[in-house]
Amino acid sequence: MLFEVPHRAVLSQVSFLLPCDSNDAEAINGIAAPVSRLPQPWRSGLACFEALLESADVVLAHNAAFDRQWFGHGPLPAIHKPWLCSMEDLRWPAERQLRANPSVRDLALAYGVPVWAAHRALTDCIYLAQVFERCDELEQLLAQGLEPRRLYRARVSYEERHRAREAGFRWNDPVSGAWTRRLSEREVQRLSFPVVPLEEPCSA
């Protein structure tokens, strides 16, 4: 889906299935591998997707770390544009009462967007687009989400672990035995407990 931020408008969208021999995620997305191999113009769909990608400034996904791993393999093109994660990089307004890393479903419902299906790419994109349409501070959220980030470990005791959890840090993910989260320098300054960097800063 190609979304234009200033006008809060969906400009174009496309959905198609890539043929596959098996689908380990069938129980989640409901796509049977034989269905993916039925005759359909998937190459034309892929060409349309590549045209949308060429027009985009930023690639956004919910749980971008999962989605970006598939690009540059098989028929999917490599993506060299900035990635932005609507689950981890965007700090949604406190009045929406969302967890630090909300699901697409929870995010949609917090903005009054009805949820009628889940775990399909286009429906997830529709939910996100409708959230963006309702988000008055979208430009600020996106700009702050694109700030360089690095992985930090929270320096909290066992008794204080709730402070890290409430700040969106994850235990054992991706570092075993540690509370960690990717943060910008601005976000680090706002924390109420000390942290230590675990990697060099990088853009999305």
Which residue ranges define each predicted feature?
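Conserved beta-strand -> loop -> alpha-helix junction used to position metal-binding or nucleic-acid-contacting
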Residues: I79-W92
